[in-house]
Regions:
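Polybasic, glycine- and aromatic-enriched phosphate-binding surface used to engage nucleic acids
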Residues: 1-200
Length: 201
């Protein structure tokens, strides 16, 4: 049963190293405190996409994707996704590589609780988004398993978006806030644990 599986944030999870377990963090920018630095999308070379919970959406078959004007041409000019979609503050906010992130606030009408997506390098996350923090040895381990970090993250994202995991999260959820502790407690068996260990030994 799922309750027997290792939890994402466990010390004995396949992704954990001696130094660090997988941590889930809230997005680096507090949207209220930095409201003057967040503006509507305006494409220039230096524009940095600002990703909020509202940018996580699903297609008609339930695949999660990021609906943000930096990556899609089909967003109407007055759409909510265009507002507060660009970081216009100081550029010294740390730039992260690609990472896995999840909507932190669930809308009443959405069927899924968990909406995970791979966020491209250089994007800035608001605090309506949670993301998985992995140190370099963990990222290296994922890369070795799948040959390429981007592919590894997309593959892991598929696992995190699985229906049974979403059902589990719904069964245990207290409210419409998806917090980092809840995500670290997700039972996640990645399914490559044995094959990779054999390859390493």
């Amino acid at each position: 049963s799922m309750s027997q599986l290792p939890r994402l944030g466990d010390q004995d999870h396949w992704l954990a190293t001696k130094e660090q377990t997988v941590k889930v963090r809230v997005g680096e920018i507090d949207q209220t405190a930095h409201s003057t630095n967040i503006s509507s999308w305006d494409k220039t070379k230096s524009s940095r996409p600002f990703i909020r919970g509202v940018h996580f959406t699903e297609d008609e078959v339930g695949n999660v994707y990021i609906r943000h004007p930096a990556f899609r041409k089909d967003i109407p000019s007055r759409a909510n996704e265009r507002q507060l979609a660009m970081w216009s503050g100081k550029s010294d906010v740390q730039s992260y590589g690609p990472r896995l992130a999840c909507q932190a606030i669930v809308n009443a009408h959405q069927e899924r609780r968990l909406r995970w997506a791979v966020i491209p390098r250089g994007c800035i996350l608001g605090n309506s988004v949670n993301h998985i923090e992995m140190n370099q040895p963990i990222l290296n381990r994922l890369t070795e398993a799948k040959g390429d970090l981007q592919q590894a993250l997309e593959w892991m994202c598929k696992q995190l978006n699985r229906r049974d995991l979403d059902d589990w999260a719904k069964a245990w959820s207290a409210n419409n806030n998806v917090n980092n502790y809840e995500l670290e407690m997700l039972p996640l068996q990645l399914g490559i644990e044995t094959s990779v260990e054999e390859a390493v030994n």
